[in-house]
């Protein structure tokens, strides 16, 4: 039986990937379909992906598959053919090709079985996830943006919305998708006569969200096929105006794809226009936040002076200070991106 998980350190794998001369293509895809045995499917796909030198993050569950991967350019068509042949449900599956891609998005393959491919918190036995809203193509999206009876709902996290979104799109203020679903229903109760257009990065969240809205009595529900990635690609190919403003946040090493030239976010430390996410360099924090080049130099890549000072300590002292600390210094609240200069150690009652 071959080894069906990685045994090499992350640092070694990253160095190996960066030394590669062959270009890579970043691809994302998902499919809601019944998988009878997710563990066996996971093992078979792991062998297929490994044979083609595919890196990335893949989740499988009884409800389907969700993947963000990096494929050697020379293997893309072979990968496509083998994926389509793997299961009849995957034949012809849309593969979202990254828009702004240096091919260095992943350097290890992680494939996990989960309860859901998207953590939605739905436990209603009568919910039909297949009863989704209507798909919208790029030209239809632009038409809806000009329709006064249409409301665009962003089903991504705050830090994603913060750096880029469709014109006049509504943000659902929540930290997770499972929190967003009931809030979306609540916020839209007064707008049941409107056309509800839902979107996300690649389509997986908004597809399920559209079904949830219909389950809760909303009849005029659409969602963007392929999400932001496919919309921007098709709009450019068809010579249409791209109505997404800013950057599309992505969950890999790139942390974002440039869609338009506008910078709509600001540095969390000084307030200068900036939409570059980074993780705090302090190993006891690693907070995701927005930092401009000036502040990156000033704080040495850290989110605060406290983290800057702590990251300069000897490794043993850093480890001693991290002991018993659950979530780093929490100088920022990740969900809303607000600076809090008074809070150093988390309040256990929060």
From Swiss-Prot:
Check the record and name the InterPro entries matching this protein: Rhodanese-like_dom, Rhodanese-like_dom_sf, Rhodanese_C, TrhO, TRHO_N
**Outcome (variant: residue 202 to A):** Does not affect 5-carboxymethoxyuridine formation
Q: What class of enzyme is it?
A: oxidoreductase
Please describe, based on the UniProt annotation, the reported consequence of changing residue 112 to A: Reduced 5-carboxymethoxyuridine formation
Active site (catalytic residues): 200 (cysteine persulfide intermediate)
This entry's comment on induction and repression of expression is: Is expressed at all temperatures, but accumulation of yceA transcripts decline with raising temperature. Thus, its expression is repressed by heat shock.
Q: What is the effect of changing residue 200 to A?
A: Reduced 5-carboxymethoxyuridine formation
The reported result of mutating residue 205 to A is:
Reduced 5-carboxymethoxyuridine formation
State a single Pfam family of this protein: UPF0176_N
The reactions it catalyses are: uridine(34) in tRNA + AH2 + O2 = 5-hydroxyuridine(34) in tRNA + A + H2O
Null phenotype? Deletion mutant displays only slight reduction of 5-hydroxyuridine (ho5U) modification at position 34 in tRNAs. Cells lacking both trhP and trhO show complete absence of 5-carboxymethoxyuridine (cmo5U) modification in tRNAs; cells display a temperature-sensitive phenotype and decode codons ending in G (GCG and UCG) less efficiently than the wild-type strain.
Q: Does the keyword Isomerase apply?
A: no
User: What are the residue boundaries of the Rhodanese domain, all occurrences included?
Assistant: 146-240
Asked if ATP-binding is a keyword of the record, the answer is no
Q: Could you identify this protein by its name? A: tRNA uridine(34) hydroxylase
Q: Which organism is it from?
A: Escherichia coli (strain K12)
Gene designation: trhO
């Amino acid at each position: 039986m071959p080894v069906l998980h990685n045994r090499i350190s992350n640092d070694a794998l990253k160095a190996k990937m960066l030394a590669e001369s062959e270009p890579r293509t970043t691809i994302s895809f998902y499919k809601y379909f019944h998988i009878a045995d997710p563990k066996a499917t996971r093992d078979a796909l792991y062998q297929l992906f490994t044979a083609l030198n595919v890196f990335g993050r893949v989740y499988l569950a009884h409800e389907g598959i969700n993947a963000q991967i990096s494929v050697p350019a020379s293997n893309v068509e072979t990968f496509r053919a083998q994926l389509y042949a793997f299961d009849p449900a995957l034949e012809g599956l849309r593969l979202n090709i990254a828009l702004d891609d240096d091919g260095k998005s992943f350097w290890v393959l992680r494939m996990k079985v989960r309860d859901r491919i998207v953590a939605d918190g739905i436990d209603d036995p009568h919910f039909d996830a297949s009863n989704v809203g209507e798909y919208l193509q790029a030209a239809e999206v632009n038409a809806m943006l000009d329709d006064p009876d249409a409301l665009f709902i962003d089903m991504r996290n705050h830090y994603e919305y913060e750096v880029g979104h469709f014109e006049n799109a509504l943000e659902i203020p929540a930290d997770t998708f499972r929190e967003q679903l009931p809030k979306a229903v609540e916020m839209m109760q007064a707008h049941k006569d409107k056309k509800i257009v839902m979107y996300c990065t690649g389509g997986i969240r908004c597809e399920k969200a559209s079904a949830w809205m219909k389950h809760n009595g909303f009849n005029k529900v659409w969602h963007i096929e392929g999400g932001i990635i496919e919309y921007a690609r098709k709009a450019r190919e068809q010579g249409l105006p791209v109505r997404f403003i800013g950057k599309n946040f992505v969950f890999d090493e790139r942390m974002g794809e440039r869609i338009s030239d506008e910078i709509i976010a600001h540095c969390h430390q000084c307030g200068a226009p900036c939409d570059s996410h980074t993780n705090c360099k302090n190993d006891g924090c690693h907070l995701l936040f927005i930092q401009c080049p000036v502040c990156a130099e000033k704080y040495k890549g850290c989110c605060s002076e406290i983290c800057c000072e702590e990251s300069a300590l000897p490794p043993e002292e850093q480890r001693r200070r991290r002991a018993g600390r659950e979530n780093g210094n929490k100088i920022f609240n990740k969900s809303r991106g607000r600076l809090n200069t008074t809070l150093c150690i988390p309040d256990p009652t929060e």
